[in-house]
A protein has these predicted regions:
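Extreme N-terminal starter segment of soluble prokaryotic enzymes
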Residues: 1-4
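Active-site metal-binding loops of divalent metal-dependent hydrolases
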Residues: 7-9, 15, 53-54, 92-94, ...
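Conserved protein kinase catalytic core
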Residues: 11-14, 59, 97, 140, ...
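Glycine-rich N-terminal loop/short-helix segment of MobA-like nucleotidyltransferase
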Residues: 13-22
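Receiver (REC) domain switch-region micro-motif
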Residues: 48, 176-178, 217
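Conserved catalytic scaffold of divalent metal-dependent phosphoesterases
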Residues: 100-203
Length: 223
């Protein structure tokens, strides 16, 4: 089994040089994604796992929205053409908006070997069972755990996520693989993403991952 794991594309506009109306950082992102497609052509993976944050911003103007959606759709369609199965999972809501993913899912609806995942669940493929744990939604969590302090929220949410890791593992029959868009304590943050987002940062404890005994853990979020 061969897996192409990717995440945190952040398709969108960034602060940086603009030449002839083209944002060069955004252009570089697209070039990197096109290079990834070339790798897929050469490697022919069985499964492509995209672990969240396809887009950079949830709320953008109509022109950018169209351009970014076309870019995402084209890249995913190309990956689907050169692999056997593609799983695209939603990341954090401030990047991967609910409306964006509804449109993305609709755009990819007729591509039979693509699954767009917005809720926790297990995707069963001929090669492995992929447990998917998309990014958090603050309001959804607070509805489940009302009236807690910030510290209590983090503890409750982290326990909830850990429980989901075990519950999804129990649904796996073939080779179990976890896709998740959360921080794992102890991860390498040398790229500059050095804060644990102290206001709100539920994590997956390493102990939970070890105990759940997934064959592979394919993360997004910290980069």
């Amino acid at each position: 089994m061969k897996i192409l794991h990717t995440a945190d594309w952040h398709i969108g506009q960034f602060k940086g040089p603009v030449v002839d109306g083209v944002n060069l950082r955004s252009q570089d992102t697209v070039k990197c994604l096109e290079y990834m497609v070339q790798v897929a052509i050469e490697e022919k993976p069985d499964i492509v796992c995209v672990s969240g944050d396809i887009f950079h911003q949830e709320q953008v103007g109509p022109v950018r929205y169209s351009d970014e959606m076309i870019t995402a759709t084209n890249i995913i369609t190309s990956l689907a053409h050169f692999s056997k199965y593609v799983i695209v999972m939603r990341g954090t809501p401030n990047h991967d908006g609910a409306a964006q993913f509804r449109v993305l899912e609709r755009m990819l609806l007729n591509i039979r070997n693509v699954d767009v995942v917005t809720e926790p669940g297990v995707i069963k493929t001929p090669w492995a069972d992929i447990a998917c744990l998309p990014g958090f939604d603050k309001q959804e969590f607070r509805a489940k755990f009302p009236g807690l302090s910030a510290d209590e929220e983090n503890l409750a949410w982290t326990k909830y996520i850990s429980d989901m890791v075990f519950a999804l593992r129990a649904e796996c029959e073939k080779t179990p693989i976890l896709m998740a868009h959360y921080t794992v304590p102890g991860c390498n943050m040398e790229s500059g993403q050095t804060s644990f987002f102290t206001n709100f940062e539920p994590v997956i404890p390493r102990e939970a991952l070890m105990a759940a005994r997934y064959e592979a853990v394919l993360l997004g979020h910290i980069h």
